[in-house]
Amino acid sequence: MNIYTSPTRTPNIAPKSGQRPSLPMLATDERSTDKESPNEDREFVPCSSLDVRRIYPKGPLLVLPEKIYLYSEPTVKELLPFDVVINVAEEANDLRMQVPAVEYHHYRWEHDSQIALDLPSLTSIIHAATTKREKILIHCQCGLSRSATLIIAYIMKYHNLSLRHSYDLLKSRADKINPSIGLIFQLMEWEVALNAKTNVQANSYRKVP
């Protein structure tokens, strides 16, 4: 399944037939080939039942070329190479005091949290860091659901891709991601909000004499 077969989030900038959106690509060994769509979610598995260190055996995983990494709960040593760290797990330790040189954000999400109000500010934090070419780590406890949801939301907004595209893109680079169904529903609402904002902006532009 080609991850670019669905339309982009806004039809006015969709690629021509057969042409992929111009996203930078990662090296082959940094990507997975498994492409499962949000509508084909596996049963959600609680992090407590998994061997977390086997999910990312090589440490933080580069998932987007703008220096965005996905990971499970890190050690202090693993945080040191990063400029910005976003921890979106209620149960994960807040390590900001141990890494004073790192811009550290802790949003205490649970798997059933209402995250919609946090997505605009969090995706803006990520985007601001990318414009400064800073190295960004986004993590939760396992690195499968909450942190993946945030990265998908970022892709949707700043790469202007649909939820399906954004999910498949991240899935192709971190094949074990598995956002809970509740978070997927909230990403669907995020997509509606982004489309509504785009339509308002497009209409305003057309009214300019």
Swiss-Prot record:
Gene Ontology CC, one term: nucleus
Basic and acidic residues bias (residue ranges): 28-43
Biased composition (Polar residues): 1-11
Binding annotation for 4-O-phospho-L-tyrosine: 111
Key words, A-Z: Disulfide bond, Hydrolase, Protein phosphatase
Intrachain S-S bonds: 47-142
InterPro entries recorded: Dual-sp_phosphatase_cat-dom, Prot-tyrosine_phosphatase-like, Tyr_Pase_AS, Tyr_Pase_dom, TYR_PHOSPHATASE_DUAL_dom
Highest taxon in the source lineage: Eukaryota
GO BP annotations, alphabetical order: cell integrity MAPK cascade; negative regulation of MAPK cascade; signal transduction
MF terms (GO), sorted A to Z: MAP kinase tyrosine phosphatase activity; MAP kinase tyrosine/serine/threonine phosphatase activity; protein tyrosine/threonine phosphatase activity
Disordered as annotated region, ranges: 1-43
The keyword rRNA-binding is annotated on this UniProt entry: no
EC number from the UniProt entry: 3.1.3.48
Pfam families per the UniProt record, alphabetical: DSPc (PF00782)
Boundaries of every Tyrosine-protein phosphatase domain copy: 59-196
Reaction(s) catalysed (UniProt annotation): O-phospho-L-tyrosyl-[protein] + H2O = L-tyrosyl-[protein] + phosphate
Residue numbers annotated as active site: 140
Function text: Mediates dephosphorylation of MAPK substrates such as SLT2, acquiring enhanced catalytic activity under oxidative conditions.
Similarity comment: Belongs to the protein-tyrosine phosphatase family. Non-receptor class dual specificity subfamily.
Protein's name in the database: Dual-specificity protein phosphatase SDP1
Originating species: Saccharomyces cerevisiae (strain ATCC 204508 / S288c) (Baker's yeast)
Lineage: Eukaryota, Fungi, Dikarya, Ascomycota, Saccharomycotina
